[in-house]
């Protein structure tokens, strides 16, 4: 009996000793074995881009923690004062199609960049290439190529990495002696008014709309040569494209469709407005148009019919200028500084935001020349040289403002961190990330 008790006592002592060893090893505090609440608190102070691309790859536990979509959604809502997305009755929310991780990272990356633009970007002005107002600009191929056109009837193709500032140390806007890769002084017989690519991420062709009643096709792979001229019969004020299908908005209130494989004549025409078609925007299989008659219309390219038209844009003396359509919002910018929110799925008017308040009658209004949406951000540019950056929530929440070195801006484009504007004084103005140098 005593032997049995002694055996049990020894076994208990061994278990106690092993427990003490395990306790000692577990008491070693490492980041990996911290409670999840503490890990999340630490993560809330870190760069979301670092969390996704570095910390989540350290170990399986971190990957599992950061894979929670609700976590990224919480971080998005902690950044804003309103609601995101701007509308809460979207089908993509019901179907869980919104990538909250992408939204959170996009918000953080863009805010850091544009809130400290002097440290993060090179601000460069290019002059003496065009000799009249540069009315339209375009960025393609991840911001590596820029195309410009203007009232000198010419077009230029720029290799963005070649646009280097004269003074690398000066944070003020600097001049560049960069020359375009190709230039066509006689691209059109009238003003070049709008540009569009066949595919913005891997463009091989660019389409130019002009007051000479044509839309021309330019091949980026064969020396910027014109390979087709579409006959519009009236001044072309806007153009969009998807692959081989090209659509042009005309001064005559019509919208024409062309097929690059068919030839120079239109394959379809429709008339959704009672005034000149001022802007077009393509989204999925649809094309939105706005007109001087202050209405919005949407065309279904697949069905070949109007989905909706005569959607009133509530402006007094203003007229619509630009369109931006994303999965979460459809915006129309007008000539008096207001941004009008439309439902991106139903295309009905929701609300107007006064981005630039109407000034006294003796001062000019700020026209919204361009509007750009990314997963979490909104960029709005005025013709008075002010560019505002917002979280794309409701209402839009401004976090940065950048001023151009001019008061006469014609158009703004943004792609992959590169921003360019056209100017009335025949110059182009670039903001290029420092890491590209």
What residue ranges belong to the model's regions?
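Blade-level signature of beta-propeller repeat domains, shared across WD40, Kelch, NHL, RCC1
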Residues: 410-437
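Solenoidal tandem-repeat scaffolds enriched in leucines and small polar residues
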Residues: 228-309, 313, 318-323, 327-329
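WD40-repeat beta-propellers
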Residues: 155-159, 209, 215-219, 255-259, ...
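Short C-terminal beta-strands that terminate individual repeats in beta-propeller domains
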Residues: 125-129, 167-177, 181-187, 226-231, ...
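Conserved strand-to-loop turn within each blade of WD40 beta-propeller repeats
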Residues: 149-152, 209-212, 249-252, 290-293, ...
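Canonical WD40 repeat/beta-propeller blade segments in eukaryotic WD-repeat proteins
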Residues: 131-138, 189-197, 229-242, 275-281, ...
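Intrinsically disordered, low-complexity acidic/Ser/Thr/Pro-rich linker and tail segments
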Residues: 2-44, 49-138, 142-144, 149-181
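Structural hallmark of WD40 beta-propellers
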Residues: 52, 143-147, 202-207, 225-228, ...
